Amino acid sequence: MQKRLTLLGSTGSIGDSTLDVVARHPERFSVYALTAHRNGDKLVEQCLRFAPEVAVVGDAATAAHVEAKLRAAGSKTTVLYGPQALVDVSASDGCDTVVAAIVGAAGLAPSLAAARAGKRILLANKESLVMSGGIFMDAVRDHGAILLPVDSEHNAIFQCMPRDENEHGGISKIILTASGGPFRTREPATLADVTPDEACKHPNWVMGRKISVDSATMMNKGLEVIEAHWIFGLPGERIDVLIHPQSVIHSLVSYRDGSVLAQLGNPDMRTPIAHALAFPERVDAGVDQLDLAQIAQLSFEKPDYARFPCLALALKALEEGGIASAALNAANEVAVEAFLERRIGFMAIAATVDAVLNALPNRSPNGLDDVLAADADARRLAAGFIAKAPAPRVERIV
């Protein structure tokens, strides 16, 4: 039976990759809704190609622009805007599958709506679990939703996991791999001089600017550890991080008998997306087959927490529980935005997050409102710290 998709964040890198896979299998997948924030022109192009029933954008002005262009082209796609519209298309009877690819906290409400509507959720928005892991997973279980991870690391672990629920099938630990980003071998003393363009030059993956910076700080890997904790139900001490510069092994599962299962593939997000879209079947993702002889060498090393303090901060937040992870995520989003706008230096990202975690009293959230309040408090504190931070030492355009 053909799957009907709502694609949240269709104009981003995950959205592009998802639509590439969808286009290869029109007999399997059709598009009910596409959403974007302000990239209206790209959304129009996608709507004209995939003919969704609904398109959602962030504001009225973008909606008017998109609707005018669609009507001029003869499209009948309905154009909506605003946060509630995102929630509505995620819970709509018009779709059975929701690809949650909105970056950041903005993706929480529609992802949670999809869970409460019992949808099949392909989760690329790790912030939903980082901010409200217990609430989100309860919604998945209580409403019969199906959660399939799209992040390459979590999808790799999912593929290496046993399909039964018996004590996780004898699992000892799971191991998330990380490329180490563009600054893995750079002298730590020079990191204060990093520019946004340098931070966004990932050695292996094609990603958006925010997640590229998160990869450079390794905050992305820290968020993925928190995400893995909630998806797979393992404590932080049974989730390891391993630097693997080639990005060929996407993650590993270590079993009690000494066996280690790994998922390998070329670094292309279409592979985990195609796996999740078609699961439990397999379909062509348009990705070249892996040639290990050509790669010749795979290397590994432990992460340097002094070089990557954001990773240490994320692990600490997971250990502390409560609202710490939500505060971590919010402070990081504000700090990364400030860095990309050249208002703070690269190392000030970790300093801002650390300051917020120290300033905000931890507490156990009683519900989503508490999580959102913690998010708002952390953003306010982060903005205050950034306003007092010194300007970047170097302003280079690379």
UniProtKB/Swiss-Prot annotation:
Pathway where this protein functions: Isoprenoid biosynthesis; isopentenyl diphosphate biosynthesis via DXP pathway; isopentenyl diphosphate from 1-deoxy-D-xylulose 5-phosphate: step 1/6
Required cofactor names: Mg(2+); Mn(2+)
Coiled coil stretches, renumbered: none
Residue sites binding Mn(2+) per the record: 151, 153, 224
Gene Ontology biological process terms in this record: isopentenyl diphosphate biosynthetic process, methylerythritol 4-phosphate pathway involved in terpenoid biosynthetic process
Catalytic activity: 2-C-methyl-D-erythritol 4-phosphate + NADP(+) = 1-deoxy-D-xylulose 5-phosphate + NADPH + H(+)
Keywords: Isoprene biosynthesis, Manganese, Metal-binding, NADP, Oxidoreductase
Keyword NADP: yes
Positions with a binding annotation for 1-deoxy-D-xylulose 5-phosphate: 126, 152-153, 179, 202, 215, 220-221, 224
Entry EC number(s): 1.1.1.267
Entry keyword annotation includes Cytoplasm: no
HAMAP family, alphabetized: DXP_reductoisom
Entry's family note: Belongs to the DXR family.
Record function comment: Catalyzes the NADPH-dependent rearrangement and reduction of 1-deoxy-D-xylulose-5-phosphate (DXP) to 2-C-methyl-D-erythritol 4-phosphate (MEP).
PANTHER family for this protein: 1-DEOXY-D-XYLULOSE 5-PHOSPHATE REDUCTOISOMERASE (PTHR30525), 1-DEOXY-D-XYLULOSE 5-PHOSPHATE REDUCTOISOMERASE, CHLOROPLASTIC (PTHR30525:SF0)
Protein known as: 1-deoxy-D-xylulose 5-phosphate reductoisomerase
